[in-house]
Design a protein with these regions (language model features):
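Glycan-recognition and catalytic cores of secretory/periplasmic carbohydrate-active enzymes
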Residues: 1-122
Length: 122
């Protein structure tokens, strides 16, 4: 027996449970702004991410030396993913411009063939 399973669009999914709704609000209101500051190395006492700075270096916007973990680029991508989910659910509109700017930076940092991994390209 074969069933057709369809995935609903994110915009059509509404979190109505008080517990999970609370966590979705916390992500949009607290986690995203905090994580953005971490990605930009602006939180005293927190280990530097170097994520956004490495993208700036790859984009030619900074002459600093690449630093951080081999995989630190992915932190910026995961932040963008979280913003996208928040936007799709009607939360996080305030991050749209910042997300657009990060997307532009990523596009500028890519190799001509689209490849991007600052550990290997810098």
């Amino acid at each position: 027996m074969k069933q057709n399973i369809t995935t609903p669009a994110l915009q059509n999914i509404k979190i109505t449970d008080p517990l999970f709704g609370h966590y979705a609000d916390v992500v949009a209101e607290k986690l995203l702004p905090y994580q953005w500051e971490v990605l930009n190395d602006r939180i005293p006492g927190v280990e530097k991410s170097h994520s956004v700075e490495n993208l700036r270096i790859a984009a030619g916007e900074s002459s600093a030396q690449r630093q951080g973990a081999v995989f630190c680029d992915t932190d910026a991508y995961k932040w963008l993913e979280a913003v996208a989910y928040c936007l799709a659910s009607g939360r996080g509109k305030q991050y749209e411009q910042t997300a657009d700017e990060l997307i532009d930076l990523i596009a500028k940092a890519q190799e001509p063939d689209g490849y991007l991994d600052t550990y290997y390209t810098l």
